[in-house]
């Protein structure tokens, strides 16, 4: 005989077992590995339980995703501000103290060179205190105009401009060719406690000027025309009288010829 199977009882027992298995959901705070229920059920109430299980599965996944990205957490933290060092001369900013120290040492070297050139320039401008050469003063002034003085502004150059030194024109200084009256007097020959001509040095050559020697048979008009460049009238008369005196002396000599 065949056994009689009651399908209604088996279906009801299967549904009850599925309900019991589906109701087993984690409630505690500590999440443990969850086993998924793959059994099929025909009750509509089981949909809510599946939603709870899916939500419980998503929570640990989100926590692991946050812990697996430490770079994002570092980006969210506030960035530390870098220290900035500023120069005392030109207010330039540096990010390291070593770079600032080298920059300020360059400023100090420029300042020492400027002071040295200033002393040399003052010694050339005031001859009593140092070198009396005007060329040295012009050279030092030209060197001063080329110095790059960072952070000092135009203070140093204005102090030199008050002394009469101008940039880009000291090389063509006219004062080198000028001479004081004292130096001109020293270079002039003295005759009879006076000076020759209108302060003209004796070494100046004049092509038109000719010497009038005594005993020459030149006419007086030519003698005056030769010395027309001279402004001193007394000297012209003196030369003319000297010629006449020389001619009279020759005529006043005694005649020593023998006459028979």
Curated annotation (Swiss-Prot):
Region annotation (Disordered) ranges: 1-24, 51-82
Keywords, comma-separated and alphabetical: Abscisic acid signaling pathway, Metal-binding, Nucleus, Zinc, Zinc-finger
Single GO molecular function: zinc ion binding
Gene null: resulting phenotype: No visible phenotype under normal growth conditions, but mutant seeds are hypersensitivite to inhibition of germination by abscisic acid (ABA).
Top-level taxonomic group: Eukaryota
InterPro entries: ZFP3-like, Znf_C2H2_sf, Znf_C2H2_type
Alphabetical GO biological process terms: abscisic acid-activated signaling pathway; glucosinolate metabolic process; negative regulation of abscisic acid-activated signaling pathway; regulation of DNA-templated transcription
Main subcellular location of this protein, as a coarse class: nucleus
First and last residues of each zinc finger (C2H2-type): 85-107
Bias type Low complexity, positions: 12-24, 51-79
Signal peptide: none
A GO cellular component annotation in the UniProt record: nucleus
Cell compartment(s), UniProt: Nucleus
Function description: Acts as a negative regulator of abscisic acid (ABA) signaling during germination and early seedling development.
Additional facts recorded: Seeds over-expressing ZFP4 are insensitive to inhibition of germination by abscisic acid (ABA).
UniProt xrefs under PANTHER family: C2H2 AND C2HC ZINC FINGERS SUPERFAMILY PROTEIN, TRANSCRIPTION FACTOR C2H2 FAMILY
Protein's recorded name: Zinc finger protein 4
Source organism of this protein record: Arabidopsis thaliana (Mouse-ear cress)
């Amino acid at each position: 005989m065949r056994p009689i199977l009651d399908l209604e009882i088996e279906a009801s027992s299967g549904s009850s077992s599925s309900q019991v298995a589906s109701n087993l959901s984690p409630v505690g705070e500590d999440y443990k590995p969850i086993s998924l229920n793959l059994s099929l059920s025909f009750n509509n109430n089981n949909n809510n339980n599946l939603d709870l299980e899916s939500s419980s599965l998503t929570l640990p996944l989100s926590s692991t995703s946050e812990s697996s990205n430490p770079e994002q957490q570092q980006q969210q933290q506030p960035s530390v501000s870098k220290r900035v060092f500023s120069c005392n001369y030109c207010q330039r900013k540096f990010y390291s103290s070593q770079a600032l120290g080298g920059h300020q040492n360059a400023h100090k070297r420029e300042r020492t060179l400027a002071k040295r050139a200033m002393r040399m320039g003052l010694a050339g401008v005031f001859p009593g205190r140092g070198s009396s050469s005007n060329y040295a003063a012009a050279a030092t002034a030209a060197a001063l105009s080329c110095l790059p003085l960072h952070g000092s502004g135009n203070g140093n150059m204005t102090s030199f401009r008050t002394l009469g030194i101008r940039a880009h024109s000291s090389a063509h200084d006219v004062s080198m060719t000028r001479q004081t009256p004292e130096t001109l007097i020293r270079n002039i020959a003295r005759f009879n406690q006076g000076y020759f001509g209108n302060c003209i040095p004796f070494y100046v050559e004049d092509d038109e000027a000719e010497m009038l020697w005594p005993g020459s048979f030149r006419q007086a008009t030519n003698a005056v025309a030769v010395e027309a460049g001279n402004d001193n009238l007394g000297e012209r008369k003196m030369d003319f009288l000297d010629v006449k005196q020389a001619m009279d002396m020759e005529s006043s000599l005694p005649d020593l010829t023998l006459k028979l």
